[in-house]
């Protein structure tokens, strides 16, 4: 049996695609019994638990102790739950650092045989660069905790080769016992049909001008999304090319309001539930992925990149964004934000289809099944 353990991850579009979808895929595609154990905030606990169990019926959802600084104490409820339910997993996969540390202690107590660290980013750098937590004790200890997770796990998944490089330079990790698997698509993105009719219908639903070239930003307004850099890029593009319009699929911010006032009729914004985003992305031409030059971003593998491609969009991307900036140049998947052409061209259906096919070849979970099977072989 395999347990996939999360600590502090709340239900969201990312949770659906990177946790629930993964657990369901692994259970359906291998001979292993796979169980999600998720510690979530007590705030909205019951509705969030229902939301998780609706999509992953056998998930075991537990309330976290209040305040992230008490994360380690959740291990007692986890250990007790394993014993009460009679579970003895051969492998615990820990999503990120804190879950992996709890899994390592479970191994020390004989409650599991092996531990896998599912590394989603450079967590110590992220906490420092973006003040993810505001607690001195956590900030002081996260680097040594991350080192322990990286070095003591039996196997590791990294979302990018750049993340493995970070482990090597920061923690003296010797590469060899890891598998690089990028953030993969939610299964709903595997079934998108592209046609001229569908693209036109998507533009009409959002009220976009059909004759203009559409840039889209889809995602959160978190600090690492680098809103100020995005604004500078958009102002330059909108000034230089009057045939451009911009769609924001996010919460409306002061930046969006300011751009809308400065460029009347060329800025649209909508906040959509995750299951509706793809149908609007299909009507666009270029996805925006602009990030600061921080360690957090240099090792990242944002799933938004794969989602843009799956909807047939080229990507305007910052340099040094994980493994993806080089990939964009190599495979003609868009442009670096620092090396744009004089004028952006409207995407043809042929080009959209080519890019979508690239996404389906590189970012669906099924394509990484041999890697997952090898991981299971190495750890169970």
Please tell me what each predicted stretch does.
Residues 250, 254-281, 286:
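Nucleotide-activated donor-binding/catalytic signature segment of Leloir-type glycosyltransferases, i.e.
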Residues 13, 225, 271-280, 287-307, ...:
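Nucleotide-sugar-dependent
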Residues 3-5, 209-225, 230-234:
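Conserved donor-binding/catalytic core segment of Leloir-type glycosyltransferases
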Residues 24, 78-86, 101, 105-109, ...:
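Membrane-proximal helix-turn-helix segments that form the acceptor-binding/catalytic region
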Residues 103, 140, 147-177, 185-189, ...:
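A short, active-site helix/loop in glycosyltransferases that binds the activated sugar's phosphate group
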Residues 7, 63-64, 116-147, 165, ...:
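Acceptor-binding helix/loop patch of EC 2.4 sugar-transfer enzymes
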Residues 1-49, 232-241:
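N-terminal subdomain of nucleotide-sugar transferases
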Residues 339-379:
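A charged, aromatic-enriched C-terminal amphipathic alpha-helix characteristic of glycosyltransferases
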């Amino acid at each position: 049996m395999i347990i996939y353990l999360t600590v502090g991850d709340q239900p969201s579009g990312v949770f659906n695609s990177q946790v629930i979808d993964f657990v369901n895929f692994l259970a359906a595609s291998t001979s292993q019994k796979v169980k999600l154990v998720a510690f979530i905030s007590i705030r909205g606990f019951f509705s969030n638990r229902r939301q998780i169990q609706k999509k992953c019926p056998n998930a075991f959802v537990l309330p976290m102790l209040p305040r992230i600084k008490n994360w380690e104490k959740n291990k007692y409820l986890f250990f007790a739950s394993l014993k009460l339910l009679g579970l003895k997993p051969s492998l615990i996969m820990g999503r990120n650092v804190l879950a992996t540390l709890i899994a390592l202690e479970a191994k020390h107590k004989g409650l599991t045989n092996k531990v896998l660290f599912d590394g989603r980013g450079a967590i110590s750098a992220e906490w420092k660069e973006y003040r993810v937590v505001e607690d001195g004790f956590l900030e002081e200890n996260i680097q040594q905790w991350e080192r322990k997770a990286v070095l003591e796990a039996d196997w590791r998944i990294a979302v990018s080769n750049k993340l493995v490089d970070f482990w090597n330079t920061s923690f003296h990790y010797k590469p060899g016992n890891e598998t690089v698997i990028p953030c993969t698509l939610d299964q709903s993105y595997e079934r998108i049909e592209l046609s001229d009719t569908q693209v036109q219908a998507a533009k009409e639903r959002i009220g976009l001008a059909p004759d203009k070239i559409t840039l889209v930003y889809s995602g959160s307004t978190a600090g690492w999304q680098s809103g100020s850099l995005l604004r500078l890029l958009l102002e330059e593009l909108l000034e230089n090319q009057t045939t451009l319009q911009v769609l924001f699929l996010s919460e409306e911010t002061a930046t969006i309001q300011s751009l809308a006032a400065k460029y009347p009729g060329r800025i649209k914004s909508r906040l959509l539930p995750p299951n509706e985003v793809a149908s609007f992305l299909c009507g666009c031409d270029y996805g925006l992925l602009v990030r600061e030059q921080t360690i957090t971003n240099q090792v990242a593998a944002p799933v938004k990149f794969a989602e843009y491609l799956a909807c047939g969009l080229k990507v305007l991307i910052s340099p040094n964004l994980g493994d993806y900036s080089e990939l964009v140049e190599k495979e003609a998947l868009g442009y670096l934000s620092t090396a744009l052409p004089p004028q952006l061209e409207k995407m043809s259906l042929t080009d959209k289809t080519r890019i979508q096919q690239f996404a389906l070849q590189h970012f669906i979970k099924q394509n990484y099944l041999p890697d997952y099977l090898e991981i299971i072989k190495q750890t169970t």
